[in-house]
Design a protein with these regions (language model features):
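Metallocofactor- and cofactor-centric catalytic cores in central/energy metabolism, strongly enriched
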Residues: 1-133
Length: 133
């Protein structure tokens, strides 16, 4: 049995976010927790290494609020990183580019919100540390 932890979307996926999101194998999503990894709990810009934040938040929502994990989507946006250590780390799995501008991120988030609402209308969104959130 395949156990899913979360989904990553790259800045390079822009223009195709809906198509990529449709690969999520769960038919129903009621709650999406999103991070861009830019401001992780005093640790700073962790890029895609920030996936633990949406996963952890959803675990908290499951344990404390009874949110069913099968209707949740932990989502990390790979919009680059300004962390030079990560950019130079050969083991870093994120896109090796400087973090996109606020204007570019805003356009990306607009496309993302439209796509998420078209695929799973009526869901709740929680943006955890994000540059624009």
């Amino acid at each position: 049995m395949l156990t899913l932890i979360g989904m990553y979307l790259s800045y390079n996926d822009r223009g195709n976010l809906k198509k990529v999101l449709q690969n999520w194998p769960k038919a129903n999503v009621e709650l999406t927790v999103v991070t861009d990894g830019s401001r992780i709990l005093g640790l700073g810009d962790l890029g895609i290494n920030g996936m633990g934040i949406p996963v952890g938040k959803l675990a908290l929502y499951t344990g404390c609020a009874g949110i069913r994990p099968e209707v949740s989507l932990p989502l990390t946006l790979d919009l680059g990183t300004n962390n030079g250590k990560l950019l130079n780390d050969p083991l870093y799995m994120g896109t090796r580019m400087k973090r996109v501008s606020e204007e570019e991120e805003g356009k990306y988030l607009d496309e993302l919100m439209v796509a998420l609402n078209e695929i799973w209308p009526g869901q709740v969104f929680s943006f955890r540390p994000c540059k624009l959130c």
